[in-house]
C-alpha cells in the first residue's frame, strides 16, 4: 500500500515538473507587473488543475472496492473506540473535579 502512495506522489511531481519546464515566461518590464502576477497566478492554478486531474485519473484507475470497504470499516471501528475512551476519560475528569469518591 505504501508503494501506491509513493507512485501517486512521484507521478504528481513528475507531471508538475514537466509542466514547469514547458512554461517559460520571458522577462517583462516592471510596468506590467500586475499582468505578470496574474500570469503567475493563472499558471499556478493551471498546474494545480493538471495535478488534480492526474491524481483523480490515477485514483480512478487504481480504485479497489475491497480496500475502500476495509478503510471504511477500520474508520468506523476506530471512531467507536475513540468515542468510548473519550467518554471514560470525561467521566474520570468529572469525578476528580467534583471530589466525589
UniProtKB/Swiss-Prot annotation:
Residues 66-74 are annotated as: Lipid binding. Residues 1-22 form the signal peptide. Keywords: Chylomicron, Glycoprotein, HDL, LDL, Lipid degradation, Lipid metabolism, Lipid transport, Secreted, Sialic acid, Signal, Transport, VLDL. Its main location: secreted. Proapolipoprotein C-II is synthesized as a sialic acid containing glycoprotein which is subsequently desialylated prior to its proteolytic processing. The keyword Manganese does not apply. Transmembrane segments: none annotated. GO terms for molecular function: lipoprotein lipase activator activity; phospholipase activator activity; phospholipase binding. It holds the Pfam family Apo-CII. One of its GO terms (cellular component) is spherical high-density lipoprotein particle. It is found in: Secreted. Residues 78-101 are annotated as: Lipoprotein lipase cofactor. InterPro entries: Apo-CII, ApoC-II_dom_sf. GO terms for biological process: chylomicron remnant clearance; high-density lipoprotein particle clearance; lipid catabolic process; lipid transport; lipoprotein catabolic process; positive regulation of fatty acid biosynthetic process; positive regulation of triglyceride catabolic process; positive regulation of very-low-density lipoprotein particle remodeling. Belongs to the apolipoprotein C2 family. Component of chylomicrons, very low-density lipoproteins (VLDL), low-density lipoproteins (LDL), and high-density lipoproteins (HDL) in plasma. Plays an important role in lipoprotein metabolism as an activator of lipoprotein lipase. Both proapolipoprotein C-II and apolipoprotein C-II can activate lipoprotein lipase. This is Apolipoprotein C-II. It comes from Bos taurus. The gene is APOC2.
Amino acid at each position: 500500500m505504501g508503494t501506491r502512495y509513493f507512485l501517486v506522489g512521484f507521478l504528481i511531481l513528475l507531471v508538475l515538473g514537466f509542466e514547469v519546464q514547458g512554461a517559460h515566461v520571458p522577462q517583462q518590464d516592471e510596468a506590467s507587473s500586475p499582468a505578470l502576477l496574474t500570469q503567475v497566478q493563472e499558471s499556478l492554478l493551471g498546474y494545480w488543475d493538471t495535478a488534480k486531474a492526474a491524481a483523480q485519473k490515477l485514483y480512478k484507475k487504481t480504485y479497489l472496492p475491497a480496500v475502500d470497504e476495509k478503510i471504511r470499516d477500520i474508520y468506523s471501528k476506530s471512531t467507536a473506540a475513540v468515542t468510548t475512551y473519550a467518554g471514560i476519560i470525561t467521566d474520570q475528569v468529572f469525578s476528580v473535579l467534583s471530589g466525589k469518591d
